[in-house]
Amino acid sequence: MKGSLIVAGCFAGGFIAGRLAEYSPEWLHTASLWLLYLLMLQVGMGIGSDPKVKEMLRTLTPVSLLLPLTTVAGALILTYPVAFMLKAVCVTDSLAINSVCGYYSLSSIMLSQLKEPLVGATLAAKIGAVALLANVVRELIALTGAPLIARHCGKEAVIAAAGVTSVDVCLPAIRRWCGERYVGLALVHGTVIDIASPFMLTLFASL
C-alpha cells in the first residue's frame, strides 16, 4: 500500500513539474530509455536471485500455468467493452495496458517509449499515465479487497486479481487470506506474467 502511494505521489510530482516547465529537455527521452533498460535488467536479476525460485519450480505443473493464462485472457477480454465505453484510449493501447496485469512501472515507461515515435511525445505521455494509474489502482483493489474476493469469489480469484504483484507486493495478503498452500501457486502466477508482460505489451503497442 505504501509503495503504491509513493508511486502515485511521484507521478503527481512529475506531472506538476512537467506542467510548470516551459519545454521538455532533450535528455529526458534518453534518460527514460535507459531507465527502461535498467528496469528490464532488474526484472531478470530479481527473478534469478529470488530464493523462492526453487519453491516455485517445485510447484510448477501444467495445471498451475492455467491460472496466469486465465488471468491474462480475462484481462484482455474485459478490455473490449471497457475501451468502447470510455473511449479515452484506443482498444489496442488498452490491450497493452491491461496485458501487464498490474505491472505499473514497466507499462508506464515502456508504453510511453514505444508509442512516442507513432503518436508523438504528448499523447505517448498521456497513454503512459493512464497505464500507470490503471495498474496502480488494480494493485490497490487487490490489496484492500483480498478478504472479500477470497470469501465471495474463491482463493484463486485473489491471486488473479493481484496479477503480476502476486509474486511480491500482494503475496502477504495472499498468504493471509488464502493460506500457505496457495503461496507456491501465487509465485508461479506472478513470475509467468512478469516474464510475459514485456512481450505482450510490445505486441499490442505495435498494432
Label each region the model flagged.
Residues 51-80, 127-140, 185-193:
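Entry/N-cap segments of selected transmembrane alpha helices
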Residues 10-15, 37-42, 64-77, 97-109, ...:
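Small-residue-rich segments of transmembrane alpha-helices in multi-pass membrane proteins
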Residues 36, 40, 142-146, 158, ...:
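Alpha-helical transmembrane segments and their lipid-water interface positions
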